[in-house]
Amino acid sequence: MRKTSLLNSNISSVISKMGHTDMLAIGDCGLPIPKETERIDLALIKGVPGFIETLKAILEELQVEEVLIAKETEKVSPELFTKIKEIIKDTKITFISHEELKKELKDCKAVVRTGEQTPYANIILKSGVVF
């Protein structure tokens, strides 16, 4: 059994294959996922699992150098945005429109779908290097 906290084999598999600047998205339960992008569906019921707990778990395993967030998030869901900033600390944030974020999903290695129902609870994580 794995010693790290992330137990989901599909997420671990995607992360293990990611290189520098590859992208992985985490989305709320309403985020449209392109057919060509791998979907890792964790949604069980409304709110479970949550976006924040999923983000925390993935960040324990993935080195991230930049995050892409819809600029609408800060205004529409300020509490969520504050929590994201606390978690990612000094990681670079690039703001794009929600429509642009949805287009970027086509270039992601996968989208992790949560049960989150907070508006704009979506993020794209750009992989960094550990050296």
From Swiss-Prot:
Substrate binds at D28, H98, Y120, A121, N122. The active site is at H20 (proton donor). Its EC number is 5.4.99.62. It is found in: Cytoplasm. SUPFAM superfamilies: RbsD-like (SSF102546). It catalyses: beta-D-ribopyranose = beta-D-ribofuranose. Pfam families: RbsD_FucU (PF05025). GO terms for cellular component: cytosol. Pathway: Carbohydrate metabolism; D-ribose degradation; D-ribose 5-phosphate from beta-D-ribopyranose: step 1/2. InterPro entries: D-ribose_pyranase, RbsD-like_sf, RbsD_FucU. One of its GO terms (biological process) is D-ribose catabolic process. Belongs to the RbsD / FucU family. RbsD subfamily. Catalyzes the interconversion of beta-pyran and beta-furan forms of D-ribose. PANTHER family: D-RIBOSE PYRANASE. Homodecamer. This is D-ribose pyranase.
